[in-house]
């Protein structure tokens, strides 16, 4: 066992820091791919340009050719890795999706309005749809980043399909979302209640008196003896996003028997709907809002360290998932055989602190979570704990599947654009971990703020140039000792993808 796991550690940790080619998947390569590999459609690259962009030595930074081809004058830039993988395994998509109301039968997204092709996206001045169209449905804006590992297959599939899964969750709740004056009904078809209502209950005493609302009373809804939760409208959108992530992951699982869908991916998306931004994250990409010179975090990273207790608890409840080769307990270092019977510091799923325990034979097994920081791995294999795909991922040279420990559930945070006025310099920055591995939030704040301050506020290219500047700062300059950034620090050798989304455009749409 030790030799096998040691082999996994050596092959994985030695040279592939972010975990890409070192992951062991068993998906059949003789199957056709679901979607051909490409770069984001909105970049408008020719096949020759895509080939030239894959230069691991020069690492050219790609930006939008036409700024008006993304909503809200959104800026975007990307760069390939320094040789970690053949392709840039990041993927990005941006859509404006119109969803029809459900009427009798299941409705589906309007194919023409869902912007499947990049050229159909409206520019920043043409986002508002006709009133008669909005009566029949609802429109949402969508930005997404997918950071692939062990191949770009899952990232490509998710970039093509996730927004459709979101749209499929919306038809049933369109009228409810539009009517913010009343609470969402507990059951569809019930009469909605005003949000100013003090209670959604009927006391037993009132029922026995035959008052308004009692059984037989002509004026009232059905009797309820128990308090009902008041569900905010935004929770319906959060639930729709959570279900869309789940369905996307299940779809990848189903289709991998028909198509070759390599690896897995993290997913960071933003949905603008009815005046609010919904940021959903599953993985280690990051989103921050820069407003009035301040940072508002809009996501959390999900790694073996941040999700240690969840992973340990699952292993505690289902020890068979460990294949009799791993221990769910954490120790400050690997336990040695000579330490059996001694007292050593340890940490279990129920603990944030540490305690001492007597070392047993079982503690000699390899730890479920191995390494620290960016080197932390689940079963010495993968460094992210949430995302899409990875259904075939196994521990090296074993039959132990890692997918049971990985979750597709995103964390969703909400930002109400209507509650704030925004200047031309207030932005939402989305980026894959290639940026955040080398730049702190404060460095991104300083870079974006200073760059935009020196740009014409009316220049629509300013956000693309700001995204390009961030990528350049994270990639650095190639020197004798590799890619270097400010203060001669090591630059990012990972794929880097960045959106810079101006928030004042959201106020205009609202």
Swiss-Prot record:
Asked if Hydrolase is a keyword of the record, the answer is: yes
Arranged from A to Z, the UniProt key words for this protein are: Cytoplasm, Hydrolase, Nucleus, Protein phosphatase
- What superkingdom does the record give? Eukaryota
Its subcellular locations are: Nucleus; Cytoplasm
Recorded hits in Pfam families, A to Z, give: PP2C
Q: What reaction is this protein's catalytic activity?
A: O-phospho-L-seryl-[protein] + H2O = L-seryl-[protein] + phosphate; O-phospho-L-threonyl-[protein] + H2O = L-threonyl-[protein] + phosphate
What protein name is recorded for this chain?
Answer: Protein phosphatase 1H
Molecular function GO terms recorded = phosphoprotein phosphatase activity; protein serine/threonine phosphatase activity
| InterPro entries for the chain | PP2C, PPM-type-like_dom_sf, PPM-type_phosphatase-like_dom
Q: Where is the PPM-type phosphatase domain?
A: 73-503
Tell me which family the UniProt entry assigns to this protein.
Belongs to the PP2C family.
EC number assigned by the record: 3.1.3.16
* Region: Disordered, residue numbers: 105-128, 188-225
């Amino acid at each position: 066992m030790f030799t096998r796991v040691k082999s996994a550690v050596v092959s994985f940790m030695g040279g592939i820091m972010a975990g890409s080619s070192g992951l062991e998947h068993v998906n059949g390569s003789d199957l056709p791919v679901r979607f051909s590999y490409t770069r984001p459609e909105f970049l408008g690259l020719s096949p020759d340009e895509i080939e030239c962009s894959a230069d691991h030595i020069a690492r050219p930074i790609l930006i939008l050719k036409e700024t008006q081809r993304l909503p809200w004058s959104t800026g975007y830039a990307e760069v390939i890795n320094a040789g970690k993988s053949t392709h840039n395994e990041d993927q990005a998509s941006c859509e404006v999706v119109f969803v029809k109301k459900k009427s009798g039968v299941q409705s589906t997204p309007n194919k023409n309005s869902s912007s499947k092709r990049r050229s159909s996206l409206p520019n920043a001045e043409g986002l508002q749809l006709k009133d008669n169209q909005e009566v029949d449905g609802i429109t949402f804006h969508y930005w997404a980043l997918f950071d692939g590992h062990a191949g770009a297959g899952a990232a490509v599939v998710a970039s093509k399909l996730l927004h459709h899964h979101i749209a499929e969750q919306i038809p049933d709740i369109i009228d409810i979302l539009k009517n913010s004056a009343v609470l969402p009904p507990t059951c569809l078809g019930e009469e909605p209640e005003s949000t100013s209502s003090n209670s959604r209950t009927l006391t037993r005493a009132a029922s026995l008196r035959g008052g308004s609302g009692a059984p037989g009373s002509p004026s009232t809804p059905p009797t309820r003896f128990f308090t009902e939760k008041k569900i905010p409208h935004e929770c319906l959108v959060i639930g729709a996003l959570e279900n869309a992530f789940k369905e996307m992951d299940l779809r990848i699982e189903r289709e991998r028997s028909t198509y070759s869908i390599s690896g897995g991916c993290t997913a960071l998306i933003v949905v603008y709907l009815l005046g609010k931004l919904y940021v959903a994250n599953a993985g280690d990409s990051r989103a921050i809002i820069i407003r009035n010179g301040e940072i508002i975090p809009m996501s959390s990273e999900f790694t073996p360290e941040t999700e240690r207790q969840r992973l340990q608890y699952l292993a505690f409840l289902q020890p068979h998932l460990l294949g009799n080769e791993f221990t769910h307990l954490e120790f400050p270092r690997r336990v040695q055989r000579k330490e059996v019977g001694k007292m050593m510091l340890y940490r279990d799923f129920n603990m944030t602190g540490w305690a001492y325990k007597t070392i047993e034979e079982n503690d000699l097994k390899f730890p479920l979570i191995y390494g620290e920081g960016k080197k932390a791995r689940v079963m010495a294999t993968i460094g992210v704990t949430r995302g899409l795909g990875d259904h075939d991922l196994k521990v090296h040279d074993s039959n132990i599947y890692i997918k049971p420990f990985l979750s597709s559930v995103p964390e969703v945070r909400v930002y109400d654009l209507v509650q704030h006025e925004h200047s031309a310099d207030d932005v939402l920055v989305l980026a894959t971990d290639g940026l955040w591995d080398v730049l702190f939030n404060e460095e991104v704040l300083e870079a974006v703020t200073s760059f935009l301050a020196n740009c014409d506020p009316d220049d629509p290219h300013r956000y693309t140039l700001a995204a390009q500047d961030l990528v350049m700062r994270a990639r650095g300059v190639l020197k004798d000792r590799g890619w270097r950034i400010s203060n001669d620090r090591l630059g990012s050798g990972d794929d880097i993808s960045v959106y810079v989304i101006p928030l004042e455009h959201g106020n205009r749409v609202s």
